[in-house]
Every structure is written in structure tokens, then in C-alpha cells.
């Protein structure tokens, strides 16, 4: 049904339901109003206060000074007509010059201005005759010192008085990174990398380790090198001339924050201050055979660039992409339909596998108590003169060879086990068509998965690539065999931590061997029984892979089969970087101290990735070892990798952050989303080492330390026990997120969560990019009957479906006549109130009674009315992603329906009591206040 977007202020045509059921104001609890997503941080702190983002105290602009020095007249003369007027520095949202609201004494006159004066004295901007030759358009002509830059102001908010928390804050960008004018060499108003690529827990960096320690805030980077599954969905500029300028000492790459010296012949590194020669080809276009405009080079204008690397960056020529599929053919995988569904999905996705240069290779290995190898015929083996070449019925039958020695597996033949995808596509399709019939009558319950992975590794060790394991059986024979250890009596006790650790050293040690030979292992696990996810997930964790868990999966359920087929097809289609390493550099006195994520640590500062996934992020903890004297510091992540098309490239991500010696500056620029991501990774580490209880204690202790520091050093006066709970506005969602983490399935105190589910959750918590991690911790909660008229319809300008606003995750909003959607990014629940009106049920489900509403895993029917279409559009939009493979299941939950399903849905309402957690979010905040004042 085609829909027109209603004009602003008008209502679209829709069925009229009883007024009391669909009146927004009538349904909300007293005193509650929907948060306004357009409000800046701090908007609810005080109507008259200087808001985080207020415009009344913005410092006056200073002229831009190009970041160059030591001019030599006549060199790189600017072309005629180059503007010479000053450029106003960018004013980021949230810059305010007045006293900090709520803490006038703490933010005295020296705050933000005089506190930076001495730092700015160290900033070499223009003094001594700046190099003006070839200055970028818009650069100022005079040499002078720019005015000190005002940093973010700190604003207090009362967490208990301003309740419930405004969850629209979760979608706001991080606090602005405010750099001094002229910090960019080209005058680009926004040279910093987007926070989607790199964000820091502290957007103002403390100048000393003592200040960092005093703040109790974590100092870490959250890095996501790729923001889309495919290059076409990214917009990263490429430097293709292989002219790469790097510092001779620290090996950092030239970027928008360097300084050109001596008439542009040399450049000063912004990391270590060493002066380097500019490469001879830097100002020359070898392709067009003419000089180039230096200031148009991508690496001087953009902080995320990709260099095409010359031959010296290669240890060996880029290898082809290789996929080896290890398929479980034991009786359980045959009966639940995994083998047939996997074979069909692989066949349908062969054309989606990256194969730009026709070099991609594939192989197949089936496993039960033996190993089944398949020799696939090549195109030249097809008989000539028997029809058109490539027809499926012209390909010879693949040969199967069985190896029963699972303790020391070997390759039964040297060739034809790993074949070219383009040359052998017909033979591959023929094999995939026949796999189900080959093992249809098996009764073998055993699985030698560990031995199969060893055999697959032998097959591709000299090339590298991916081993893709699809299994629904606990590995119970051969190398790395496991036993059932799902002790329900241990759940929720101190012994539960042992069940989250690997039961066999094989899976970690062999993952390290895989990483050394550029092999990644990905696990797709399907079972209604115990599968020891804790042990099996070690293979992906230390080989830069991922664990995908499908509990209770069965192909006869269309929703299960559809979810796996969609996700696996997306997985196969994502573009891969291979033979990759990641190194993060920064200024003198700053060191990367700890790394979190799925990879192999080759050295203290080098992370190795056999293949670089597109849907994961990484956390890097930072130490300050020396006092920082610079007015700003720079972090640079470099990823050396090979592309699927056979090019060696370096993706470079650079971000600069101001520094300060004032505690209030550090708190005012702290990023609550990045801090939560860091805490989640630390809690996962603690849970895997000690258990969920220790993880919960870690989260609670870190939060209490921040509140204690804030009260002691940043609150205006010492107040009594009846005082409110104050915190800085830009961190006001941090307690909510920590509360949600403590109640999350990965850490929650309960005896009802199987260890496999908890282990799979820990895998996600340690790898999800921050926007999906926050949603996984604090799900999106939509009220589908009290939503704007435009929600669920295409936007008139963008054509994108408009989503309804989110509301707080509390059961007080689950009105009995309502319809609600809970979405944590992995699963969705459509909640139907027990008193839902027949007209609503008819429009959404096509039934007239609540008892007729189908519950459980399902999809909405397609009905000929606008409300049904809007709900389906919202669900489809929630599933729409270009940077992840996840396709959420939809569970319909009736308020008066199955108790287990209802309980599962309500555990996502993390502002309420959840199982044994025992406290609401309001009580959680009250307990923090009592602890502070005790």
C-alpha cells in the first residue's frame, strides 16, 4: 500500500480507536513527559542555567593561523586569488564561557582560560615568521598567537530530582573536542576523525598520571576501524600514489596536525616533534605528470584515510581469500536441519562471496566421528561436447574421502581439496546439493570438531584465510574433546565462574597457532543442548574471529531458518581485510597499556588479525607516564592489511584531544558511552577470570569511586545526608548504564541463565561496536500506540522510515491496553497488553480476541491497513543495518500469556527489579547516595 507523508501539523488518515486508549497525555504517569531529543546535555538541570550547548557565552572567534613555521619567501607561493582573510575557528556545540552551573566556586575565574594560558605558551603557532608559501585557501596571513581556547564547562545535575533519566542523552554525540584555533595545518574546520571510528573516554586529556588517578575516570580509546560491511557503504578517501610520509623516529603517519617548516621542505611530527623531510613525490602527481596542490592531499585534510602501500609494506604478495567450511554431519545436525540449511545458504551466497580478482578459494570438510574430505572437480575436468560448459549436470560427481584417524589428522590428497571459486562453481554447487542426501541416514552422534579444525588448518596454513565452523554437537571425540559440565546447581554461585572458563587448553593454544599462520576461526553454534560455548569461543577470541550462537535452533521453524540464512549470507558477503596488524601511537609520555577484543597480541603494542572483521570494535587502555606539556595530544591508529582485491593498504585514523591540568575540565569532557564500553570490557575480563559476582563488584566499585571523587573535589559545598545525588550532566546516563550492565544476562545474579547463554552474551559484550553495545545493555523501548503520526512512514526528504521516540525501560509504561516493542539489537519483543482493544488486534494481527494472538517466535501478518504497515515498517527499520549481520528474531508476548516468555521480556526493563537484582534504578541511585554520605 503506497503511503504519502502527511504535511507537518496534519494527521494522516488512520482508524479511530477509543480516545482514552490513544490519548498520549491520558496514559502517562503524573509528572512524566517524553524527553525531548533536541535538548542538549543538561537541559533539565535548570531552566535558567547555562546549558551544555548554550550559546550565550561562546568565546569570541580568533583568527586561524596556519600551523607552519620558518617561512622562506618565494617557496610554494599561493596561486593568485587565494583568500588571505582569517578563518573563524569552529565553535563546537557545548562551548560556554560562564561559570559552571551548580559549582560556582569550583569553576572560578581561572577555569578554562587562565588555566590554559601557560599551556598555550608551548604551542608553536606562527611565532618567528610562519611559513606562508602555499598556505591553504582561507589561511590567515599574519603571524600571531591565537587566544586561549575555552574548554567544555561542567554542569551539575541532581540524578534523583531529575528522574526518570532523559534517555535521549544516549543518542547524543560525545562532548565536543575543542582544539585551539590553528591546530589543523590546512584550516579544515573539522579535521578530527569521526567518533564512529575512534572515541576516547576523556575528550580532554589530563596532563599527569596523578590527575588521572585522582579523577577515578578510565582513560581508554574505543576503536572501530571499519564502519560498514562493504567498502561501498563507507566514504574513506584513498591516497593511491604510494607516497607515504612517516616520521623517522616514532613511525607515525603525516596527518592534519603536523607543522611544515623551512618553506615546506620539512615537517614536524605532532607525536614526537622530530623534523622530517617531505617526500619528493608529495607535491607531484605522477599519474598526471604535473605538480599537485599540496593542500588538497587527503591525508592533510582528513583524519581517516587509506594509503595504497608500496611493495616494502609486504612480507609476501597478498594472498587470495580462502574459506574452509567445516560442517557438522552428526545425527543431531542432520535432524535439526542445520546441514541442509547451511548447504543451501552457502550455494545461494556463492556469488556474494568477495571474488573481485577471481582468486578466492573454498574447501569443504564434514565431521562426525571421522573426517570427510571432498575433492571438487575443476572446470577443465568437464567433458567437452556434452552441452554448454558450466551446466550443473555436466560436472563430475565430487569425491568423498574419509579419514578415521582423528588424533593425528592428515590430508588424503594434495590437490582438489581447496579449489578456485570461479573455476569450480559448478562442482561446488553439485557438492552442496548432495550433502544432505549423503548423510541423511546417519545415526552417528559423535563430533570430532577439534580434529576437523586441525585438518582445515593444515589445508590452508600456507595461505591463510577463514575456517568457518557450523556445528550443533558438543565436540566429544578427538582433539579438544569436551564433556558436559552444565551444573545447574552451580548457577548463581561462586562456582559459576569456572563454567565460563575453557575446559580444555586446546582451544586457546590452537587459536594462537592459527593466528601465526594468518588463519581465523569463526564459530556458528546451534543447539538445544549444552555446547560449551565458553570453551569453543576461545578459538574465535584469539584468532580475530567471532562466535555466533543460535540457541534452540531448528530448521523446521521458518523464523529460525530465515534468521540464519539472512545472517550467514551477510556474513559471507562482507569484505575482508587479511594479514592485518593494528598499532596505536600517541605523543611522548603516553603509552597503550592494555588491549581488549578478539585478536592475537603479537607484542606489547601490536595486535594481529588474520582477517579483520567489519562488525567489531576494540578497546585500548591508555597510561600517562610523563607530564604532558602540549596543549593537545594526538592518537593515531594504523591498520596495515591486504584487501580482497589483492592490494596492500594502510588505514590511518587520527584524533586530537586538548589537555588540561584541571579536574573539572576532565569531567566536563568525559564520554559516558566510551566509559561504558570500557567498563563492559573490563567486566567481561573479570567474569572470565573470577566469575559474574566479581564483575558486578568491579562495575559498582568503579562507579562509586567516580561519585566519591566528584563529591569531594567538584561539588560546591559539603552537604548532609538529605542532599541530592549530584553528578556532571554529561555523565548522568553512566549510572543508568552501569545499573543495566549489572542486570544484563552476562553478569546478572541468577540461577536461571544457562552457562552457554551467559558465555555467548560475554562474547557480544566484548566485541559489539558502541552503538550496538549500548542498545544491547539498554534496549530501545517503543510505545507503538502513542507515537507521532509520521512514525512508521517514510520521511518526506530522506525517504527513510521515521522511528518513534524511545521511552524509559520501566514496567510503569506497560499499560494494559498498549502495544510495545523492546529491541536490544539481538532480539525483539512485541508486547501486547491484556486489555488491548479488538480494533487494535484486528489491525495488527488480523484477529479480534487477545487469546487468538499468536505468541512466541513469529512475524507479523501483512494486512491491508496503514497501522499494520507502520508497525511492520518500524520492525524492518530496526533490523536494517549496513555495518552488522544481525537480524533480530521477533517474539510476540501477551501480558496474560506464557510466564517464561513474559519473564524473559520483562528482564529487559532494567529500571525495574530484575530477578535477584532486587532494586529498581531509583533505589540503585539512593544506595549510592547513602554510601557517599555514610
From Swiss-Prot:
UniProt GO BP: COPII-coated vesicle cargo loading; intracellular protein transport
Gene source species: Yarrowia lipolytica (strain CLIB 122 / E 150) (Yeast)
Protein name, per record: Protein transport protein SEC24
Region feature Disordered, mapped onto this chain: 1-56, 70-89
Superkingdom, natural source: Eukaryota
Database matches in InterPro entries: ADF-H/Gelsolin-like_dom_sf, Gelsolin-like_dom, Gelsolin-like_dom_sf, Sec23/24_helical_dom, Sec23/24_helical_dom_sf, Sec23/24_trunk_dom, Sec23_24_beta_S, SEC23_SEC24_subfamily
Residue ranges, annotated region (Zinc finger-like): 247-272
Presence of keyword Transport: yes
Assembly and binders: The COPII coat is composed of at least 5 proteins: the SEC23/24 complex, the SEC13/31 complex, and the protein SAR1. Golgi apparatus membrane; Peripheral membrane protein; Cytoplasmic side.
Gene: SEC24
GO MF terms, alphabetically ordered: SNARE binding; zinc ion binding
Positions bound to Zn(2+): 247, 250, 269, 272
Sorted UniProt keywords: Cytoplasm, Cytoplasmic vesicle, Endoplasmic reticulum, ER-Golgi transport, Golgi apparatus, Membrane, Metal-binding, Protein transport, Transport, Zinc
PANTHER family given in the database record: SEC24-RELATED PROTEIN, SECRETORY 24AB, ISOFORM A
Amino acid at each position: 500500500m503506497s503511503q504519502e507523508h502527511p504535511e507537518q501539523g496534519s494527521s494522516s488518515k488512520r482508524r479511530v480507536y477509543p480516545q482514552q486508549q490513544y490519548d498520549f497525555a491520558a496514559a502517562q504517569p503524573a509528572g512524566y513527559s517524553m524527553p525531548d531529543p533536541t535538548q542538549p546535555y543538561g537541559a533539565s538541570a535548570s531552566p535558567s542555567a547555562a546549558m551544555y550547548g548554550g550559546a550565550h557565552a561562546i568565546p569570541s572567534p580568533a583568527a586561524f593561523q596556519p600551523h607552519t613555521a620558518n617561512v622562506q619567501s618565494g617557496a610554494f607561493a599561493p596561486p593568485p586569488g587565494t583568500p588571505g582573510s582569517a578563518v573563524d575557528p569552529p565553535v563546537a556545540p557545548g562551548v560556554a564561557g560562564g561559570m559552571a552551573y551548580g559549582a560556582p566556586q569550583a569553576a572560578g575565574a581561572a577555569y578554562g582560560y587562565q588555566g590554559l594560558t601557560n599551556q598555550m605558551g608551548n604551542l608553536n603557532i606562527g611565532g618567528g615568521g610562519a611559513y606562508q608559501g602555499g598556505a591553504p585557501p582561507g589561511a590567515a596571513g599574519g603571524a600571531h598567537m591565537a587566544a586561549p581556547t575555552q574548554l567544555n564547562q561542567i554542569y551539575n545535575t541532581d540524578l534523583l530530582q531529575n528522574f526518570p533519566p532523559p534517555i535521549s542523552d544516549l543518542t547524543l554525540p560525545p562532548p565536543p573536542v575543542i582544539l585551539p584555533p590553528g591546530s589543523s595545518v590546512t584550516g579544515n574546520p573539522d579535521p578530527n576523525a569521526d567518533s564512529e571510528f575512534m572515541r576516547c573516554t576523556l575528550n580532554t586529556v589530563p596532563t599527569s598520571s596523578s590527575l588521572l588517578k585522582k579523577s577515578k575516570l578510565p582513560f581508554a580509546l574505543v576503536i572501530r576501524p571499519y564502519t560498514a560491511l562493504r567498502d561501498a557503504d563507507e566514504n574513506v578517501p584513498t591516497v593511491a600514489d604510494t607516497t607515504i610520509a612517516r616520521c623517522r623516529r616514532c613511525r607515525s603517519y603525516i596527518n592534519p596536525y603536523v607543522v611544515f617548516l623551512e618553506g615546506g621542505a620539512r615537517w614536524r611530527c605532532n607525536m614526537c616533534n622530530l623534523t622530517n623531510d617531505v617526500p619528493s613525490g608529495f607535491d607531484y602527481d605522477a599519474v598526471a605528470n604535473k605538480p599537485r596542490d599540496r593542500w588538497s592531499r587527503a591525508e592533510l585534510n582528513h583524519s581517516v584515510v587509506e594509503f595504497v602501500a608500496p611493495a616494502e609494506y609486504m612480507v609476501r604478495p597478498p594472498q587470495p581469500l580462502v574459506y574452509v567450511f567445516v560442517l557438522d554431519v552428526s545425527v543431531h545436525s542432520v535432524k535439526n536441519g542445520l546441514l541442509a540449511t547451511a548447504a543451501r545458504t552457502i550455494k545461494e551466497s556463492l556469488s556474494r562471496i568477495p571474488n573481485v580478482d577471481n582468486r578466492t578459494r573454498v574447501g569443504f570438510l564434514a565431521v562426525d566421528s571421522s573426517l570427510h574430505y571432498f575433492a571438487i572437480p575443476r572446470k577443465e575436468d568437464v567433458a567437452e561436447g556434452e552441452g554448454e560448459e558450466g551446466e550443473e549436470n555436466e560436472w563430475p560427481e565430487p569425491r568423498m574421502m574419509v579419514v578415521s584417524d582423528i588424533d593425528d589428522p592428515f590430508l588424503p590428497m594434495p590437490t582438489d581439496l581447496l579449489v578456485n571459486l570461479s573455476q569450480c562453481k559448478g562442482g561446488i554447487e553439485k557438492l552442496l546439493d548432495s550433502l544432505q542426501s549423503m548423510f541423511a541416514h546417519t545415526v552417528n552422534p559423535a563430533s570430532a570438531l577439534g580434529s576437523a579444525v586441525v585438518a582445515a588448518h593444515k589445508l590452508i596454513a600456507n595461505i591463510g584465510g577463514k575456517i568457518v565452523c557450523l556445528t550443533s554437537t558438543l565436540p566429544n571425540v578427538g582433539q579438544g574433546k569436551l564433556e558436559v559440565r552444565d551444573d545447574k546447581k552451580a548457577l548463581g554461585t561462586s562456582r559459576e565462574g569456572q563454567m565460563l572458563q575453557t575446559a580444555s587448553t586446546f582451544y586457546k593454544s590452537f587459536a594462537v597457532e592459527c593466528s601465526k599462520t594468518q588463519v581465523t576461526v569463526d564459530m556458528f553454534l546451534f543447539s538445544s543442548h549444552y555446547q560449551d560455548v565458553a570453551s569453543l569461543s576461545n578459538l574465535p577470541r584469539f584468532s580475530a574471529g567471532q562466535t555466533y550462537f543460535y540457541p534452540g535452533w531448528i530448521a523446521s521453524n521458518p523464523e529460525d531458518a530465515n534468521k540464519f540464512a539472512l545472517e550467514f549470507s551477510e556474513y559471507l558477503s562482507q569484505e575482508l581485510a587479511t594479514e592485518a596488524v593494528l598499532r596505536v601511537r600517541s605523543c611522548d609520555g603516553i603509552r597503550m597499556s592494555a588491549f581488549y577484543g578478539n585478536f592475537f597480541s603479537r607484542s606489547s603494542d601490536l595486535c594481529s588479525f588474520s582477517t579483520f572483521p567489519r562488525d567489531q570494535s576494540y578497546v585500548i587502555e591508555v597510561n600517562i607516564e610523563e607530564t604532558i606539556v602540549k596543549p593537545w595530544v594526538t592518537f593515531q591508529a594504523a591498520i596495515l592489511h591486504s584487501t580482497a582485491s589483492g592490494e596492500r593498504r594502510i588505514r590511518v585514523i587520527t584524533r586530537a584531544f586538548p589537555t588540561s591540568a584541571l579536574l573539572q575540565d576532565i569531567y566536563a569532557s568525559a564520554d559516558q558511552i566510551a566509559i561504558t564500553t570500557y567498563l563492559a570490557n573490563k567486566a567481561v575480563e573479570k567474569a572470565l577470570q573470577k566469575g559474574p559476582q566479581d564483575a558486578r563488584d568491579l562495575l559498582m566499585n568503579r562507579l562509586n569511586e567516580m561519585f566519591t571523587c566528584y563529591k569531594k573535589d567538584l561539588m560546591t559545598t559539603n552537604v548532609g545526608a538529605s542532599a541530592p545525588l549530584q553528578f556532571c550532566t554529561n555523565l548522568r546516563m553512566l549510572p543508568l548504564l552501569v545499573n543495566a550492565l549489572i542486570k544484563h544476562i552476562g553478569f546478572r545474579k541468577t540461577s536461571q541463565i544457562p552457562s552457554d547463554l551467559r558465555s555467548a552474551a560475554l562474547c557480544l559484550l566484548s566485541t559489539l561496536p558502541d552503538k550496538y553495545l549500548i542498545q544491547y545493555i539498554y534496549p530501545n523501548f517503543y510505545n507503538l500506540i502513542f507515537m507521532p503520526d509520521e512514525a512508521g512512514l517514510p520521511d518526506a526528504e530522506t525517504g527513510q522510515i521515521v522511528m518513534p521516540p524511545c521511552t524509559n525501560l520501566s514496567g510503569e509504561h506497560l499499560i494494559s491496553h498498549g502495544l510495545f516493542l523492546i529491541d536490544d539489537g539481538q532480539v525483539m519483543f512485541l508486547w501486547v497488553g491484556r486489555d488491548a482493544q479488538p480494533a487494535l488486534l484486528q489491525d495488527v494481527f488480523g484477529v479480534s480476541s487477545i487469546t487468538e494472538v499468536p505468541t512466541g517466535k513469529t512475524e507479523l501478518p501483512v494486512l491491508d491497513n496503514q497501522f499494520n504497515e507502520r508497525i511492520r515498517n518500524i520492525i524492518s527499520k530496526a533490523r536494517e543495518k549496513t555495518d552488522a549481520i544481525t537480524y533480530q528474531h521477533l517474539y510476540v508476548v501477551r501480558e496474560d500469556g506464557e510466564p517464561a516468555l513474559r519473564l524473559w521480556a520483562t528482564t529487559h526493563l532494567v529500571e525495574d527489579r530484575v530477578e535477584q537484582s532486587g532494586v529498581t534504578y531509583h533505589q540503585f541511585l539512593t544506595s549510592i547516595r547513602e554510601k557517599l554520605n555514610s
